[in-house]
């Protein structure tokens, strides 16, 4: 199946491109659960080259539906059948008539709506925040806690929720705020969760980037049991489990989770690679602790980049190191 995917992907840029053969390959990949993600990736690439599919727009639209990328039905196609419109109505979110779920978002939303505890491992582009907003949009939950890793993200989340739900919920985002409403959403870092004594009778709590509950391994091979942020997050989790009826943990690249069942907290674990963007991944094979090789690769990558480029770093310290190296190499200067 990988060979079919690679051939179709490379053919998209070829002069003798056949849109029918490309969509035939997409259909074959989408029809097999093992290769479903590859088929969806090809659909995203096809939508980025719409002009090459002008002769088979209807087939492309049907493949978009088959891939579960329902938001693109509304965004990319003007000629929609009554059946297409019914699909859009079914997957429309409770908080906005203009926002449509894709199939994985709807699946997670449906699990949470039914009262199940959910642990979700998914890429950033899956749109996990829209699921929380949809639960709020239903209006059935009164008290929620959203635990986010940074103050900056708490402020960003607070602004979004204030704009959408400020008329219905009190949005609490810092330690000194007094809760004066029966309907409240706490948007806090783990430290601020632990500082408050009014977090009780919670309908649902959400922890973003829950993988940070685990202590990290040092370069020496030892486990860093002194990381205060990890300790604070575990204390916050313990506190919230005792006062909440339901939980939703989200994060990327987690294959399994242990311990919650033994503690008496049944949950549904969902691990998905559902991406709404197409990615071309190049692997350099650099060891995790080989900083010299990483900086060398950084120079090679920066030299090859001609458009605006985003570099993701795991910490402010690493971001500073990368910035200094780029400046030394002459990038980002007039």
What does each of the following model-derived ranges do?
Residues 1-334:
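N-terminal helicase ATP-binding lobe
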């Amino acid at each position: 199946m990988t060979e079919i995917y690679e051939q179709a992907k490379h053919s998209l840029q070829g002069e003798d491109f056949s849109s029918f053969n490309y969509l035939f390959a997409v259909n074959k990949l989408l029809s097999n659960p093992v290769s479903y993600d590859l088929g969806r990736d090809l659909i995203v690439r096809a939508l980025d080259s719409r002009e090459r599919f002008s002769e088979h727009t209807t087939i492309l639209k049907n493949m978009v539906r088959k891939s579960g990328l329902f938001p693109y039905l509304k965004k990319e196609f003007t000629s929609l059948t009554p059946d297409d419109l019914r699909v859009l109505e079914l997957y429309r979110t409770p908080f906005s008539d203009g926002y449509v779920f894709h199939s994985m978002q709807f699946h997670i939303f449906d699990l949470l709506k039914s009262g199940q505890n959910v642990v979700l491992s998914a890429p950033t582009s899956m749109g996990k925040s829209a699921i929380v907003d949809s639960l709020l949009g239903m209006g059935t939950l009164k008290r929620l806690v959203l635990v986010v890793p940074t103050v900056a993200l708490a402020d960003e989340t607070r602004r979004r929720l204030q704009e959408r739900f400020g008329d219905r919920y009190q949005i609490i985002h810092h330690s000194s705020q007094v809760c004066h409403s029966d309907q409240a959403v706490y948007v806090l870092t783990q430290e601020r969760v632990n500082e408050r004594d009014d977090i009780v009778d919670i309908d649902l709590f959400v922890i973003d980037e829950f993988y940070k509950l685990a202590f990290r391994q040092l370069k020496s091979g030892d486990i860093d049991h002194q990381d205060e942020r990890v300790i604070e997050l575990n204390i916050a989790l313990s506190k919230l489990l005792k006062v909440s009826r339901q939980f939703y943990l989200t994060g990327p690249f987690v294959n399994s989770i242990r311990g919650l069942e033994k503690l008496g907290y049944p949950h549904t674990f969902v691990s998905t690679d559902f991406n709404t963007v197409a990615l071309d991944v190049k692997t350099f094979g650099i060891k995790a602790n080989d900083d010299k090789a990483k900086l060398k690769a950084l120079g090679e990558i920066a030299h090859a980049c001609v458009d605006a480029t985003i570099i993701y770093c795991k910490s402010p310290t690493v971001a500073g190191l990368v910035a200094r190296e780029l400046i030394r190499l002459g990038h980002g200067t007039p």
